[in-house]
Every structure is written in structure tokens, then in C-alpha cells.
């Protein structure tokens, strides 16, 4: 009777492998559909931290991140001009 209560280690291993495969397949499908946009790196909302402006600043974008419909946080384009480097003494 006690043997029926113990889960087979093979069953647990199979379930873990199946879960990992499902997550990998669904993630690659989302990326292949062009959903990811580097200008819109996150989500936004009242309870989301950091806010869009803070997230964009942390990722190296200029200040002024905004929340577009669908709760997607988007950033302003980075300047492609020369970077001001302060002189060292």
C-alpha cells in the first residue's frame, strides 16, 4: 500500500521536462511573431515599479518614457549624436 503513495521519479522528471519544453516553445513563438520591440521594453501601470520614465532611464534611454495603450511602456529614441564626455583633470 505504501508503494502506491510514492510518486515515480521518472514521472516527476518527465513532467519537469515537458514543462520546460512548453515554456521554451511558447517563448520562441512570441519572439518570432515580432512582438518584442526594443523601444517598448516593459509594462506600465499604477502598481508597476519602476515607472516608465525610471525604466527607460535605467536602460540608457533619455527621460520621457510613456505608457501606450495595452499597458506597454515605451521609451524615446536614443540620440545618435556625439556623447558629451567631461574632461578629466
From Swiss-Prot:
A cellular component term, taken from the record's GO annotations: extracellular region
Annotated compartments: Secreted
GO BP annotations listed: defense response to fungus; killing of cells of another organism
Signal peptide location: 1-30
Cysteine pairings via disulfide bonds: 40-75, 44-67, 52-73, 56-74
Superkingdom as given in the UniProt entry: Eukaryota
Keywords tagged on the record: Antimicrobial, Disulfide bond, Fungicide, Plant defense, Secreted, Signal
Similarity section: Belongs to the DEFL family.
Name of the protein in question: Defensin-like protein 78
Amino acid at each position: 500500500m505504501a508503494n502506491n503513495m510514492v510518486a515515480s521519479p521518472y514521472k516527476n522528471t518527465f513532467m519537469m521536462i515537458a514543462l520546460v519544453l512548453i515554456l521554451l516553445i511558447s517563448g520562441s513563438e512570441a519572439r518570432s511573431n515580432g512582438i518584442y520591440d526594443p523601444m517598448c521594453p516593459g509594462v506600465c501601470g499604477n502598481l508597476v515599479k519602476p515607472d516608465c520614465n525610471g525604466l527607460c532611464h535605467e536602460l540608457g534611454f533619455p527621460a520621457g518614457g510613456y505608457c501606450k495603450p495595452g499597458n506597454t511602456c515605451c521609451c524615446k529614441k536614443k540620440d545618435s549624436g556625439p556623447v558629451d564626455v567631461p574632461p578629466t583633470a
